[in-house]
Amino acid sequence: MASSSGPVLLDLYADWCISCKVMERFVFPEPEVARQLARFTLLRADVTANDAQDQALLKQFGLFGPPSLVFFSEDGREIDEFRVQGEVSADRLEAHLAQVLAL
């Protein structure tokens, strides 16, 4: 991963994932969450097909499936202690993003 001008957020999602849809419709658009998300370089990985390539990506990060959020520092190192797996509330994600941004 090339250097970025800020932290990177990799959002792994799937069209069949109900929790992904909840987060996309109700969590990410919340004003404070959206404000904090704007400070990240956002990458989205669509694992809808659940094919060999998708499985390899999930395996690479040790994830069981979407929704999953993986954070990276500006220099491309994963900040693995801040991973999010599964559906989270806007309040929880807002606090989580603030912690990552404070690093």
What are these regions (language model features)?
Residues S3, R35-L37, G62-L63:
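Extracellular/periplasmic catalytic domains that process cell-envelope and extracellular macromolecules
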Residues A52-G65:
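Structural alpha/beta surface segment adjacent to cysteine/selenocysteine redox centers
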Residues S3-C17:
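Short active-site neighborhood of thiol/selenol oxidoreductases, capturing the structured segment around
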Residues S19-A38:
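Typically the conserved alpha-helix immediately C-terminal to a functionally engaged Cys/Sec
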Residues V27-P29, F64-L103:
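Non-catalytic, surface beta->alpha helical segment in thiol-disulfide oxidoreductase systems
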Residues L9-L10, L42, L69:
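Hydrophobic beta-strand anchors of alpha/beta hydrolase catalytic cores
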